[in-house]
């Protein structure tokens, strides 16, 4: 493991203590408090710029052009936190290189009944069955038009719950038409376990017309996000379809419905009910999926790896296993902004240790971590 400075250890101690206090409150209430705090960062431009200068890692070796977009740093916020693009300008200020906002649906919807968000501290994980609660594509588009920064953002779009599967193509097309040109890239989400029947759309015959419709509706790069619970054969099929349609890339992976190997007592997990688990428990499978995708289509499209990337060592392994970009959400909750900084500093240090000028040179290199 990489060593921490005394100052870094102190910040971690303070954050851990704060986290214990926050964890006495309901998860969604904490999310609301964080939203308000980040909303201040989003809305006050001088504060935003000052934080970005102080907190973010500025190293030219981390900057790369990906599908025609310049990403200043490789780690981005994963979809699920900023569902309505209400804090779109805050994410660069806390250190992320970009942010994927959403998931957004064509029509507004409340999501599933509460409680729908649960913590598994023993696993450094979160279980959620939020159900794509959001204000709808038209309202999110208004928020995006009010942005002041030029930070890189992607928009993750999903199916409106009440829309039947046979009308999914039109539903995704509507979202893409409203949001596509307001983002740097779009991600088609067919992999959340919390919308009935959504994962069935990962089947190639269902997925092809959806992806084609989204591509026709926007000029920005289009990617697809897949589940870790797909069989290897289905992963291959989606990858081949992505190549056939000339997608910009694949985001791998979403949350898992598996409950295997958890440290949290099974009775507690069962009491939480249905939902997808994110964080450390999905790390191993996410890495497996990444390696499989890179071997099959890595030379033909961008791979964004997400799922349990908690340490700089894990981040480096994802990069050297074929990921051009990384994402995280749950480790941000457990680690705070220093987690983002640690990841970026760790990658930059490894690039220097291996004599590489740019992160692009490390992608798929299989280079080991150097202490």
Swiss-Prot record:
Residues reported to bind FMN: 79-83, 103, 156, 189, 225, 253, 279, 308, 329-330
GO CC annotation: cytoplasm; plasma membrane
Keyword terms of this UniProt record: Cell membrane, Flavoprotein, FMN, Membrane, Oxidoreductase, Pyrimidine biosynthesis
Main EC class the enzyme belongs to: oxidoreductase
Reaction catalysis annotation: (S)-dihydroorotate + a quinone = orotate + a quinol
Cofactor note: Binds 1 FMN per subunit.
Cofactor requirements of the protein: FMN
Catalytic residues (positions): 192
GO MF terms held by the record: dihydroorotate dehydrogenase (quinone) activity
PROSITE patterns (UniProt xref): DHODEHASE_1, DHODEHASE_2
Binding site residues for substrate: 83, 128-132, 189, 194, 254-255
Mode of membrane association: Peripheral membrane protein
EC number: 1.3.5.2
GO biological process, one term: 'de novo' UMP biosynthetic process
Protein's job: Catalyzes the conversion of dihydroorotate to orotate with quinone as electron acceptor.
NCBIfam families for the chain: PRK05286.2-1 (NF003648), PRK05286.2-5 (NF003652), pyrD_sub2 (TIGR01036)
HAMAP family, A to Z: DHO_dh_type2
Subunit organization: Monomer.
Descriptive protein name: Dihydroorotate dehydrogenase (quinone)
Native organism: Corynebacterium glutamicum (strain ATCC 13032 / DSM 20300 / JCM 1318 / BCRC 11384 / CCUG 27702 / LMG 3730 / NBRC 12168 / NCIMB 10025 / NRRL B-2784 / 534)
């Amino acid at each position: 493991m990489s060593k921490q400075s005394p100052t870094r250890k102190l910040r971690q101690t303070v954050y851990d203590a704060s986290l214990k206090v926050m964890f006495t409150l309901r998860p969604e209430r904490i999310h609301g408090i964080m939203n308000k705090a980040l909303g201040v960062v989003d809305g006050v431009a001088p504060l935003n710029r000052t934080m970005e200068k102080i907190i973010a890692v500025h190293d030219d070796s981390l900057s790369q052009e990906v599908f025609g977009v310049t990403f200043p740093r490789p780690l981005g916020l994963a979809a699920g936190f900023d569902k309505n693009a209400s804090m779109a300008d805050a994410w660069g200020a806390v250190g992320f290189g970009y942010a994927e906002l959403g998931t957004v649906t064509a029509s507004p919807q409340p999501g599933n009944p509460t409680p729908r968000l649960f913590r598994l501290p023993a696993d450094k994980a979160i279980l959620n069955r939020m159900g794509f609660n959001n204000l709808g594509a038209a309202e999110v588009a208004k928020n995006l038009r009010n942005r002041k920064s030029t930070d890189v953002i992607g928009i993750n779009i999903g199916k409106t719950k009440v829309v039947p599967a046979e009308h999914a193509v039109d539903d995704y097309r509507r979202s893409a038409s409203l949001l596509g040109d307001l983002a740097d890239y779009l991600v088609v989400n067919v992999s959340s376990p919390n919308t009935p029947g959504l994962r069935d759309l990962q089947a190639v015959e269902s997925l092809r017309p959806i992806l084609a419709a989204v591509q026709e509706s926007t000029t920005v790069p289009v990617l697809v996000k897949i589940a870790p619970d797909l069989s290897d054969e289905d992963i291959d099929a989606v990858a081949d379809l992505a190549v056939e349609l000339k997608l910009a890339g694949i985001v791998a992976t979403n949350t898992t419905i598996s409950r295997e190997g958890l440290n949290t007592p099974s009775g507690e997990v069962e009491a939480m009910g249905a939902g997808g688990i994110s964080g450390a428990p999905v790390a191993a499978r996410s890495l497996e999926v990444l390696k499989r995708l890179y071997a099959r289509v890595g030379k033909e499209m961008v791979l964004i790896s997400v799922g349990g990337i908690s340490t700089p060592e894990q981040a480096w392994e994802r990069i050297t296993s074929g990921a051009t970009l990384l994402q995280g959400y749950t480790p941000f909750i457990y680690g705070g902004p220093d987690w983002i900084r640690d990841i970026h500093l760790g990658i930059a240090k490894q690039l220097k240790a291996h004599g590489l000028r740019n992160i692009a040179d490390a992608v798929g290199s299989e280079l080991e971590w150097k202490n």
